Amino acid sequence: MSDVEEQYQEEQQPVVQEELQVVELATTIPLDVQEAQREVKLFNKWSFEDVEVKDVSLVDYIQIRNPVFVSHTAGKYASKRFRKAQCPIVERLTNSLMMNGRNNGKKLKAVRIVKHALEIIHVLTEQNPIQVVVDAIVNSGAREDSTRIGSSGTVRRQAVDVSPLRRVNQAIALLTIGAREASFRNIKTIAECLAEELINAAKGSSTSYAIKKKDELERVAKSNR
């Protein structure tokens, strides 16, 4: 054996030993722990894998395919029109909580509210709270609305179908408005009111502010057909 081959084997020996140590370490870690480390969970608690959108028309507009740890992407979906449809749905709910004047720009506060609300939902329903949020948004979007047609002289209202993106936008807005109004001058926190609103909307209950508004919009549209 030449000197070059001996030197090459001496250099490769510590590398092989390190690889063996890594393999031994990997085999000592339980499989469930390894899988949990690989999976991306919201707030490192809830998985996106089993979440499904039950309305076929909204599958492309409720983003749950790309999981995130925290509902904050620094506004990269606001640069182009209609790109917000690709924004994670929990982040869209978080951003909608900042719409009121005194809450403008308080993203960290909104993230904490949503996290606390999801924890409450998980305790009360024993379900994946992301699935509850998706069901609430699907149930809260009006399928039919009315619009004004005509000039200033003769104006009439005509029933029209609502696009899927507007359904999602309207549902998120109604859910957050209902939670904000319920928490105003109330002993309950806004996180508790948001959790209650999402649970009732996911069930389709008429006690939900968003469901009541949706039914009202559809009733007016039906009378203007």
From Swiss-Prot:
Keywords from the named record: Cytoplasm, Ribonucleoprotein, Ribosomal protein
MF terms (GO), sorted A to Z: mRNA binding; rRNA binding; structural constituent of ribosome
Keyword set includes Ribonucleoprotein: yes
Function text: Component of the ribosome, a large ribonucleoprotein complex responsible for the synthesis of proteins in the cell. The small ribosomal subunit (SSU) binds messenger RNAs (mRNAs) and translates the encoded message by selecting cognate aminoacyl-transfer RNA (tRNA) molecules. The large subunit (LSU) contains the ribosomal catalytic site termed the peptidyl transferase center (PTC), which catalyzes the formation of peptide bonds, thereby polymerizing the amino acids delivered by tRNAs into a polypeptide chain.
Residue ranges crossing the lipid bilayer per the database entry: none
Stored NCBIfam families: PRK04027.1, uS7_euk_arch
Source superkingdom: Eukaryota
Gene: RPS5
Biological processes, Gene Ontology terms: maturation of SSU-rRNA; ribosomal small subunit assembly; ribosomal subunit export from nucleus; translation
CC annotations in GO: cytosolic small ribosomal subunit; membrane; ribosome
Subunit structure: Component of the small ribosomal subunit. Mature ribosomes consist of a small (40S) and a large (60S) subunit. The 40S subunit contains about 32 different proteins and 1 molecule of RNA (18S). The 60S subunit contains 45 different proteins and 3 molecules of RNA (25S, 5.8S and 5S).
Name of the protein this chain belongs to: Small ribosomal subunit protein uS7
SUPFAM superfamilies per record: Ribosomal protein S7
Family label: Belongs to the universal ribosomal protein uS7 family.
Classification of source organism: Eukaryota, Fungi, Dikarya, Ascomycota, Saccharomycotina
Keyword Cytoplasm: yes
Subcellular location: Cytoplasm
